[in-house]
A protein has these predicted regions:
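Acidic-glycine-rich active-site phosphate/pyrophosphate-binding loop
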Residues: 60-73, 197-202
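N-terminal entrance/gating region of PLP-dependent enzymes' catalytic architecture
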Residues: 1-67
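Short loop-beta-helix segment that forms the pyridoxal 5′-phosphate
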Residues: 20, 53-57, 61, 73-93
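Electropositive phosphate-/nucleotide-binding environments in soluble metabolic enzymes
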Residues: 2-6, 59-66, 86-89, 116, ...
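Conserved PLP-enzyme active-site core in the AAT-like
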Residues: 90-210
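Glycine- and acidic
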Residues: 51-55, 77-82, 104-109, 154-156
Length: 210
């Protein structure tokens, strides 16, 4: 029966050993204060406060999107923000395509410590367009020749090792060779670190999922 099958599956699953990941790879546990939980996430007024008609959507949702975009511009130090994409990987791919549309070059430089799930999306989107993904260790010496044929560079902050480092050398080379500078940044990290817009990045992407 279905109940017997569920019981057996639960028994099998109970043998799994769940260990804590201290790296995260972009997925970090956070605490949501109860005041935010009650007044924002659990408050139906944000999405039903005006009208259910599709033509006008809802004033609450529009206000929430406006507040979100305003917050992102303040955190990143960049002049504009969109109303979000599907996930971090998709946003990174869209940023790559934005940079590609501004140049006839074919190489795209990627931080070798980028999150693996983001790299997979970049490679999938790059393949049909003939874009070459060039992975570089930004912690070592960076050959200038790599930037000569590149239309953009993407940096992960913090990276897959949990390191948060300024990439002044990378940004200077990108500026010299007119490469679009893209940062994949944790929005919560932007509360404590210098805004990526002030660092010199042209575009910022990240994930608000927790």
């Amino acid at each position: 029966s279905e109940q017997q099958a569920l019981t057996e599956l639960k028994d099998i699953a109970s043998h799994n050993v769940v260990k804590r990941s201290l790296i995260g790879q972009g997925y970090y546990g956070t605490i949501t204060p109860s005041v935010i939980l009650r007044n924002v996430f659990e408050n139906p007024a944000w999405y039903t406060s005006y009208t259910p008609y599709q033509a006008e959507i809802s004033q609450g949702r529009l206000e929430a999107l406006f507040n979100y975009q305003t917050l992102i511009t303040e955190l990143t130090g960049l002049p504009v923000a969109n109303a979000s994409l599907l996930d971090e990987g998709t946003a990174a791919a869209e940023a790559m395509l934005l940079a590609h549309s501004q140049s006839k070059k074919k190489d795209f430089i990627v931080d070798d410590k980028i999150f693996p799930q983001t790299l997979e999306v970049l490679q999938t989107r790059a393949r049909p367009l003939g874009i070459n993904i060039v992975k570089i260790d930004f912690d070592g010496s960076i050959p200038m020749a790599f930037f000569a044929d590149a239309f953009g560079v993407i940096v992960q902050l913090p990276n897959s090792h949990g390191n948060l480092r300024h990439r002044d050398g990378v940004l200077r080379l990108a500026e010299v060779y007119k490469c679009m500078k893209i940062a994949i940044v944790d929005p919560l990290a932007q509360v404590l670190m210098q805004p990526v817009g002030e660092m010199g990045f042209d575009v910022a992407v990240g994930s608000m999922q927790r």
